[in-house]
Each structure stands twice: as C-alpha cells, then as structure tokens.
Amino acid sequence: MIQTESRLQVADNTGASEVLCIKVLGGSKRRYASIGDVIKVSVKSAAPRGRVKKGDIYNAVVVRTAKGVRRPDGSLIKFDANAAVLLNAKLEPIGTRIFGPVTRELRTEKFMKIVSLAPEVI
C-alpha cells in the first residue's frame, strides 16, 4: 500500500536506488497504490553514471509491497520492502534488467515486458 511521500526501492538497472512517491495516478481522490499500479515518483538517490539522476520525475509501476496482495485462493503474497520499476512516458520500462521477484498480478498487456525480464514470477 503506497501513498504520497512513501519511499520505495528501485528494482531495475536505471541507476536509481531510492524513489519517493509524489502522486498516485488514476483519479483525483485516489490515495493508495498497490502492486501493478502506476505512480509518479521523484528520484532521491542515484548512481553517478546511471541513466537517471537525482531530482528527475518519472512514472513507475509498483512491483513489490510489504502490505502484500491477496489472491483469489486466499493466499497472501508479502515482501520485505516496497519496490518499483521506473517507466518512461509511454509506460515502457527504462531499464533493461529487473532485480528480485515480481508477482503474477503484473501479467497485464501493459507490463508483460517487466514480467519477461524478471528473474522470478511468484
């Protein structure tokens, strides 16, 4: 469950290591984002020679949350930390690699590229 001012780890190789959620996209009254939701983020810390730099604003998709996601069979998938993958304006991933597991909830037409790059799909 991600809201404005939430800090997330970055699960790709763009060079960013931490981002801050500045807006949950999808309606003016929308407060929380979960796995598979698109948010607007600001880069808070980045590697010196990465693709992105500190202060840049990007779209991102949430790939892991500590709150978890409930499956129809009743199981709950939780992670140790919140993580996101940075996206460009066309909602395509900026990075070429994804680190760590992602959930099956990302298997929509929009994010199949992220699922195919991920080392593990839970």
From Swiss-Prot:
Signal peptide: none annotated. This is Large ribosomal subunit protein uL14. It comes from Polynucleobacter asymbioticus (strain DSM 18221 / CIP 109841 / QLW-P1DMWA-1). PANTHER family: 50S/60S RIBOSOMAL PROTEIN L14/L23, LARGE RIBOSOMAL SUBUNIT PROTEIN UL14M. The keyword rRNA-binding applies. The gene is rplN. Keywords: Ribonucleoprotein, Ribosomal protein, RNA-binding, rRNA-binding. Binds to 23S rRNA. Forms part of two intersubunit bridges in the 70S ribosome. One of its GO terms (molecular function) is structural constituent of ribosome. It comes from the Bacteria. CDD domains: Ribosomal_uL14 (cd00337). HAMAP family: Ribosomal_uL14.
